[in-house]
Amino acid sequence: MVLSAADKGHVKGIWGKVGGHAGEYAAEGLERTFHSFPTTKTYFPHFDLSHGSAQIQAHGKKIADALGQAVEHIDDLPGTLSKLSDLHAHKLRVDPVNFKLLSHCLLVTFAAHLGDAFTPEVHASLDKFLAAVSTVLTSKYR
């Protein structure tokens, strides 16, 4: 998936608006994923999956940090996410569809919190960005 210059600008702009809430929003998106798609819980049998648990918050921060790195290095997603791709493909063996499910729930969460800043153009660009991140994260599965 090729991100246009406009897409990259929208992603960087909205990530700037997310700011210090990135970990909180990512944790909410993760929790939303667990509720909307219960099969995703199978990868977290050791987690306390209750609302706002410390483990969900901590994993949300990891997700947010990885996305922040991806935004910062938007022109080199494969290089930026290579180690994370290895981890998910070879050690964790996460079903690739779960990245799409999480991406969807992250979009819903961002839309709920960002209001008018989450324009249709931003939505489309962020969707393309998350799809590109998902593609990179699943690239080592082949």
From Swiss-Prot:
InterPro entries: Globin, Globin-like_sf, Globin/Proto, Hemoglobin_a-typ, Hemoglobin_oxygen_transport, Hemoglobin_pi. SUPFAM superfamilies: Globin-like. The modification N6-acetyllysine is found at residue 17. Disulfide bonds: none annotated. Pfam families: Globin. O2 binds at residue 59. GO terms for cellular component: blood microparticle; haptoglobin-hemoglobin complex; hemoglobin complex. Heme b binds at residue 88. The modification Phosphothreonine is found at residues 109, 135, 138. Keywords: Acetylation, Heme, Iron, Metal-binding, Oxygen transport, Phosphoprotein, Transport. Red blood cells. One of its GO terms (molecular function) is iron ion binding. The modification Phosphotyrosine is found at residue 25. Involved in oxygen transport from the lung to the various peripheral tissues. This is Hemoglobin subunit alpha.
